[in-house]
From Swiss-Prot:
UniProt key word Hydrolase: yes
UniProt entry tagged with the keyword Acyltransferase: no
InterPro entries in UniProt: AcetylDAP_deacetylase, Amidohydrolase, Bact_exopeptidase_dim_dom, Peptidase_M20, Peptidase_M20_dimer
Entry EC no(s): 3.5.1.47
Transmembrane feature ranges: none
PANTHER family associated with the record: N-ACETYLDIAMINOPIMELATE DEACETYLASE, PEPTIDASE M20 FAMILY MEMBER
Involved pathway(s): Amino-acid biosynthesis; L-lysine biosynthesis via DAP pathway; LL-2,6-diaminopimelate from (S)-tetrahydrodipicolinate (acetylase route): step 3/3
Protein name: N-acetyldiaminopimelate deacetylase
Any single Pfam family the record assigns to this protein: M20_dimer
Domain of life: Bacteria
Keywords from the UniProt entry: Amino-acid biosynthesis, Diaminopimelate biosynthesis, Hydrolase, Lysine biosynthesis
Source species of the chain: Oceanobacillus iheyensis (strain DSM 14371 / CIP 107618 / JCM 11309 / KCTC 3954 / HTE831)
Catalytic activity: N-acetyl-(2S,6S)-2,6-diaminopimelate + H2O = (2S,6S)-2,6-diaminopimelate + acetate
GO biological process terms held by the UniProt record: diaminopimelate biosynthetic process; lysine biosynthetic process via diaminopimelate
Amino acid sequence: MMLQLEQIRRDLHQIPELGFQEFKTQAYLLERINEIATENVEIKKWSTGILVYVHGKSPARKIGFRADIDGLPILEQTNLPYASLHEGRMHACGHDLHMTIALGALEKLIQDPINDDVIFVFQPAEEGPGGAKPMLESEEFQQWKPDMMFALHIAPELPVGTVSSKAGLLFANTSELFIDFEGVGGHAAYPHLTKDMTVAASNFVVQLQQIVSRGLNPLDGSVITIGKMESGYVQNAIAETARLEGTIRSTDADAIDMIKSKLNRLMKGFEISYDCTIKVDYGANYYQVVNDATYVQQFENVINQTQTITYQQADAAMTGEDFGDMLKEIPGFMFWLGVDSSYGLHNARLNPKEEAIDVGVNAVISMITSF
């Protein structure tokens, strides 16, 4: 192979960028793609993403493979010699490996074309605000719309040499949650002259939990998490404002809407009870990832035939993935790729084993060539 995949992964790891800001990443990817492109390859840009069309010899279908390209707002703490050069930004979810694997598979296909057409989708903004849906709806994507699509995600808890998937629900429906409270601040000695938003927000967090525990079918599998709370600025003053940030997750798409409806009603009640103003923003919303059973079975069969990669049955997870928006319209599946890291996803010390890159390339190529 012309491409040095380990070095590419390290280069990409050093330049993590947030959603729809992946300008350096896009330029780097285009440079590598153009190094290996031949006359049977077409390239399109969409926003900060890229679409690469590899024309087959006698196409009966279009196969799509998606790799997400954005990083996270995390300060890296790996102490690696190729750690992030962008302070406060890190590839802490493995998207550097995803891109590298896609490039490796792309080069193999260019060197040894198959009958079918293959579209490689380098998608921005998976971590937020969500790039899959607008990319899916774009003219560029629709012109090359695949007949099936698949993608992978690194799994720190799985050993290198292992892949994992399942038919049906793999990832949950998710929604971001941002709630702002505004009341009246003042001196801590005169609470009766204020509207204390620390108290209001604190009680709101407690009441939120009852939406799931007492308002939804416990078999639905839903959870509301408040991961961040801000209020006040000094110990002897009552907070005029407060902010809650969190997520809503459910294995049932209808349950997400029900939670939001109940939350809106709760919010109106709190505005009356605490004589304040409350505003809510649901941010990015990701549709559940539902794997097509036929393609998952095909993938399992293909992997078992390799004799070098182990297939493992996966469990559904409450994590969110905007690839669900693509699978809502295009049949396909997603699978986990073992990378054997002591630290998990979104951890500042995540350090996937680079041996997983070749495993990922082989798994992707095995699936693409199995049609």
